[in-house]
Amino acid sequence: MQIMLCAISNIASGNCSEDCKYCTQSAHVKTDIQKYRRKELSQIVLEAKMAKKNEALGFCLVTAGLGLDDEKLEYVCEAAKAVQKEAPNLLLIACNGMASVEQLKELKKAGIFSYNHNLESSKEFFPQICTTHTWESRFQTNLNAKEAGLMLCCGGIYGMGESEEDRLSFRKSLQELQPFSTPINFFIANENLKLQVPRLSVDEALKIVRDTKEALPQSVVMVAGGREVVLRERQYEIFQAGAGAIVIGDYLTTKGEEPSQDIIKLKEMGFTFASECH
């Protein structure tokens, strides 16, 4: 079985104006995460080269904050061009919050392949986890990305206290968007966050993967944050459940599995890694 590996680079971290209860980058909570306005382009390129060396096909440029402004747009475009020059053949993904069709077209011109903007959860549950912007504004940004001609990467976070009905509603909204790829994150509580809920069980997490693939058979299901912590020694069962991709290395503010360990284990299990997107 061939699977897709993706890596992320947090190129602008922390001090986010939004009050998302699940996020340690929010300025509304005190955490000990690294905070910086801009990562040096040379460091981004270094991370991209390392991602490519570690068999990654996708490389995501992530910025904290509500959305794109002119300055941030220019910076992301600069980063995309720098990565393309030094680490060609990576599929570049941008994750920069709310964005207009015009802004997204500029990202596409700079070499961005796909735009990631997660709905996070259902329309009904979202007001319980964020009050500073609406679920509808997130949905609209996804429509904007499609209109701009970008491939769509849209998913969310499970295990925030949502009901099974919320999960069904969430997946129905994803069906409306029909994303190219859909990330699944499993919520891991942090003592500084307002959101404190029991961790998902392994069986429940694997069921979420199965249900997502069933709802979105044409989308690449990507298991991202929380994979190692929630699924532990059973984490590679996600592929039997329908996943076709994982995020390797570190996440936005938390450590992930060492990429080399993932690669060794996956090769031992007979997996190969996609080098192009079909």
UniProtKB/Swiss-Prot annotation:
InterPro entries: Aldolase_TIM, BATS_dom, Biotin_synth/BioAB, Biotin_synthase, Elp3/MiaA/NifB-like_rSAM, rSAM. It is an enzyme of class 2 (transferase). It catalyses: (4R,5S)-dethiobiotin + (sulfur carrier)-SH + 2 reduced [2Fe-2S]-[ferredoxin] + 2 S-adenosyl-L-methionine = (sulfur carrier)-H + biotin + 2 5'-deoxyadenosine + 2 L-methionine + 2 oxidized [2Fe-2S]-[ferredoxin]. Pfam families: BATS, Radical_SAM. GO terms for molecular function: 2 iron, 2 sulfur cluster binding; 4 iron, 4 sulfur cluster binding; biotin synthase activity; iron ion binding. The keyword RNA-binding does not apply. One of its GO terms (biological process) is biotin biosynthetic process. [4Fe-4S] cluster binds at C16, C20, C23. [2Fe-2S] cluster binds at C60, C95, C153. PANTHER family: BIOTIN SYNTHASE, BIOTIN SYNTHASE, MITOCHONDRIAL. Catalyzes the conversion of dethiobiotin (DTB) to biotin by the insertion of a sulfur atom into dethiobiotin via a radical-based mechanism. This is Biotin synthase.
